[in-house]
Amino acid sequence: MFDAAPIKKVSVVIPVYNEQESLPELIRRTTAACESLGKAWEILLIDDGSSDSSAELMVKASQEADSHIISILLNRNYGQHAAIMAGFSHVSGDLIITLDADLQNPPEEIPRLVAKADEGFDVVGTVRQNRQDSLFRKSASKIINLLIQRTTGKAMGDYGCMLRAYRRPIIDTMLRCHERSTFIPILANIFARRATEIPVHHAEREFGDSKYSFMRLINLMYDLVTCLTTTPLRLLSLLGSVIAIGGFSLSVLLIVLRLALGPQWAAEGVFMLFAVLFTFIGAQFIGMGLLGEYIGRIYNDVRARPRYFVQQVIYPESTPFTEESHQ
């Protein structure tokens, strides 16, 4: 077994999108958790194009005396995982922890993740206990987790929880990947030699509403299906073969019945023919739509456009500066 490098510095990466109500409490509690580690630490807040005063609060926190907070401002909303990747590109720690800004996963769990990673794990995931989400969110999460487990073969219990710890080599490897649709927990587990999970507390959301609407969850499902595997395309080929064989068999059967029962029966079977035809057409459209998803993602990857555009980075006790597009 390989000995893992000691953890000397911890970086906490937090994507922020319209979280002005929770930010002061988030910063206070995360700072307190990091101070208890007995290691060097930093907090990176990434504003993902917020329309409220989240960015102003972040900048103010970075400019306070003895601040350990780095604020990264994106020029618009790129999504949670793109914002986290923007944070990854600015970390300096040996262990990187991701955390949502809504305080549903308590920052007080950070020392437990660090302690577990100190045992030599490359990735430390978490499983939310007594989830305080709606039935719809819980059901969608179960479906997504089952889909990921079946596709990747890695039996992690809760891929949807972003409270996770990654060692620096895993982060550096993910930054070298250039997929447009990135689901960080899965990508990290692909490269991790040793991964584990620990149970964590899950609190009810105190401020605002979830940023994952029904349509965003549907889009996430499409992202997972098309970025993880080509199995759906193989299933389409199998389905096409079954339909072709079924259609040929049905044609033979109809010809035999036509000859046996006469032309009167043929007229009575028109509606059945239409039903079969519409079934085949529906299957074709489903296949075309799924194939289009794959082609669209290939097109986006070939264009190689940046995943995000960093507008400003504010370091503690430093002057804000403007950057070019990154990653």
Curated annotation (Swiss-Prot):
Sequence intervals crossing the membrane: 236-256, 270-290
CDD domains, per the entry: DPM1_like_bac
Coiled coil ranges: none
GO biological process: 4-amino-4-deoxy-alpha-L-arabinopyranosyl undecaprenyl phosphate biosynthetic process; lipid A biosynthetic process; lipopolysaccharide biosynthetic process; response to antibiotic
Subcellular location: Cell inner membrane
Top-level lineage group: Bacteria
Cellular component per GO, a single term: plasma membrane
Enzyme Commission number, as recorded: 2.4.2.53
Pathway: Glycolipid biosynthesis; 4-amino-4-deoxy-alpha-L-arabinose undecaprenyl phosphate biosynthesis; 4-amino-4-deoxy-alpha-L-arabinose undecaprenyl phosphate from UDP-4-deoxy-4-formamido-beta-L-arabinose and undecaprenyl phosphate: step 1/2; Bacterial outer membrane biogenesis; lipopolysaccharide biosynthesis
A Gene Ontology molecular function term of the record: phosphotransferase activity, for other substituted phosphate groups
Primary residence: membrane
Cytoplasmic face residues: 1-235, 291-327
Pfam families in the cross-refs: Glycos_transf_2
Enzyme class name: transferase
Catalytic activity line of the entry: UDP-4-deoxy-4-formamido-beta-L-arabinose + di-trans,octa-cis-undecaprenyl phosphate = 4-deoxy-4-formamido-alpha-L-arabinopyranosyl di-trans,octa-cis-undecaprenyl phosphate + UDP
Membrane topology: Multi-pass membrane protein
Periplasmic topological intervals: 257-269
Keyword Glycosyltransferase included in the entry's annotation: yes
Alphabetized UniProt keyword annotations: Antibiotic resistance, Cell inner membrane, Cell membrane, Glycosyltransferase, Lipid A biosynthesis, Lipid biosynthesis, Lipid metabolism, Lipopolysaccharide biosynthesis, Membrane, Transferase, Transmembrane, Transmembrane helix
Family: Belongs to the glycosyltransferase 2 family.
PANTHER family: UNDECAPRENYL-PHOSPHATE 4-DEOXY-4-FORMAMIDO-L-ARABINOSE TRANSFERASE (PTHR48090:SF3), UNDECAPRENYL-PHOSPHATE 4-DEOXY-4-FORMAMIDO-L-ARABINOSE TRANSFERASE-RELATED (PTHR48090)
Protein's job: Catalyzes the transfer of 4-deoxy-4-formamido-L-arabinose from UDP to undecaprenyl phosphate. The modified arabinose is attached to lipid A and is required for resistance to polymyxin and cationic antimicrobial peptides.
Protein name: Undecaprenyl-phosphate 4-deoxy-4-formamido-L-arabinose transferase
UniProt organism field: Salmonella dublin (strain CT_02021853)
